[in-house]
Amino acid sequence: MQASDRFNINSQLEHLQAKYVGTGHADLSRFEWTVNIQRDSYASYIGHYPMLSYFAIAENESIGRERYNFMQKMLLPCGLPPEREDE
């Protein structure tokens, strides 16, 4: 692999990380990674009507109520963030 290839790959990766929030970066904590996964999952459930219907039937709720519940869960999907240790 040549130096120009490595530069091209790194610049493409930086572009993706700047464009899409969930792609992560080197300083991403475990909590932030988990939050991204949970939010992506909830967004997928809301966006795919059959999956949303499945959850609504399983929980005996209306589809609108399930959509609302999932959007509320997207705010803090994993609870409050842990305390940061200042260095």
From Swiss-Prot:
Leader peptide range in chain numbering: none
Source organism superkingdom: Eukaryota
GO BP terms: mRNA splicing, via spliceosome
More details: Was originally fused with At3g23315 to form At3g23320.
Family label: Belongs to the SF3B5 family.
Protein name (record): Uncharacterized protein At3g23325
